[in-house]
A protein has these predicted regions:
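S-adenosylmethionine
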Residues: 1-418
Length: 418
């Protein structure tokens, strides 16, 4: 499949997932008495993806969206459903979005959940924290494809030189991000073996994720444990920032993720001074106490729904509490590894209170004088200090002004037993 076809296919599939709830609502109103749950998954998929193209992709003519969806159904040996699919999609193509929606004022949860295609439980949860207007911004942001942030490999090039190379060699325009060494590509990168990516001139990493390495105080001779090293973004960023003067212990329990991290490190030329440990973090204990632990903890991923739209429909509210308990165990294990004066940097791709601020408060209440909260303000570039809360937690919400992923992070210094 050509790159342009692959990108278009991904856009349609992800779009169908992002707008699933609203599309299903439109389809069910159009189908009227026919319950869509009774049709085959193939027919349902054709209807959803066809409707997405009609409503959200201006560059695809409605006629083409209808015809391709019908041919897909025919190809999947669902010939009997062809008239049904053809009829439904043609009705949708002829009409504007005219069905009566829930009232915005009296039923804000139902309105937002439908208008922006999010599960009701998540909208209700967030509406308890955020104002209606901000909610609209956040939910809309979750439905937009993320920008392509890249991290320039300073060992091989400079941002300016890479911008010139991208334009000259790959006809890719880019602009500078607000973080040193960060660029934003204007189209999908060239992933071919001879491309600049494959040759290690840059790696793909959201700007919010790049910020986390700034929180790790990378002093010379420091030993740092990366508790979940795959796929290698933060690991290799620390390698570059440490300039070969730090020792990294990369812990990863997933074989494929470990391999990805190794490949990323090799591709970027940052594969020295790394000790690779194939293990669950909870089963790993270093020989000696360490200076830093970067705990990029398992989380709900509610800050990266624009990257993983299927997550909206796969997650349940009960899972937040369960993950929070798991995170506490990982935090306890991480703190045991630290020398006096050592630091744990905790991060998640979520802005849920249970996974961020509440975790920091729990650490303080549990360990008292044995720990100290270090403000991220002391580590971050000036521009990004605006994202630090009064409680000294880095909190990046969906729909932020810099179009970054949602993230949360804090720093705990281990003072030792009193």
């Amino acid at each position: 499949m050509k790159r342009v076809d692959r990108n278009l296919t991904k856009e349609i599939l992800f779009g169908g997932l992002r707008w699933y709830k609203k599309i299903y609502w439109i389809l069910q109103h159009t189908a009227k008495k026919r319950d869509l749950k009774t049709v085959s998954p193939q027919v349902r998929a054709a209807l959803i993806l066809g409707t997405y193209q009609i409503f959200y992709m201006d560059r695809i003519p409605d006629r083409a969206a209808v015809n391709e969806s019908v041919e897909y159904v025919r190809f999947k040996s669902e010939a009997g459903a062809v008239p049904f699919v053809n009829g439904i999609l043609r009705q949708i193509a002829r009409r504007a979005e005219y069905f009566t929606k829930p009232d915005k004022k009296n039923k804000p949860v139902e309105y937002l959940a439908l208008q922006y295609s999010h599960p009701d439980w998540l909208v209700k949860r967030w509406l308890d924290r955020f104002k209606f207007e901000r909610m609209e911004t956040m939910l809309e942001a979750n439905n937009q494809p993320p920008p392509v942030f890249i991290r320039v490999n300073g060992a091989k090039t400079t941002p300016m030189d890479l911008q010139e190379s991208l334009l000259r060699d790959e006809q890719t325009h880019s602009e500078k991000g607000n973080l040193k060494g960060c660029l934003i590509l204007k189209k999908h990168p060239d992933m071919s073996p001879e491309g600049l990516f494959a040759r290690g001139f840059y790696t793909i990493q959201d700007q919010a994720s790049q910020l986390i390495s700034y929180l790790v105080n990378l002093q010379p001779e420091a030993t740092i444990v990366d508790a979940a090293a795959g796929p290698g973004g933060k690991l290799t960023h620390m390698c570059e920032m440490g300039q070969g003067k730090i020792k990294l212990i990369a812990v990863e329990k997933s074989g494929p993720q470990m391999e990805r991290a190794r490949q990323t490190a090799t591709r970027l030329g940052h594969d020295t001074n790394i000790e690779w440990v194939f293990s669950d973090f909870m089963d790993y204990t270093p020989k000696d106490k360490v200076d830093r632990v970067l705990l990029d903890a398992p989380c709900t991923g509610l800050g990266v729904l624009r990257r993983h739209p299927e997550g909206k429909w796969q997650k349940a509210e009960s899972g937040i509490k369960e993950l929070a308990e798991q995170q506490k165990k990982l935090i306890e294990h991480a703190l045991k590894m630290l020398k006096p004066g050592g630091e744990m940097i905790y991060s998640v791709c979520s802005f849920e209170t249970d996974e961020t601020e509440s975790q920091m408060r729990w650490v303080k209440s549990t360990y008292g004088d044995q720990v100290e909260v270090v403000s991220p303000v002391s580590r971050l570039p000036d521009y990004f200090k605006r994202y630090v809360t009064r409680e000294n937690v880095l909190m990046i919400y969906a729909g932020n002004q810099d179009d970054m992923d949602g993230f949360g992070a804090f720093i705990i210094r281990w003072k030792g037993a009193p």
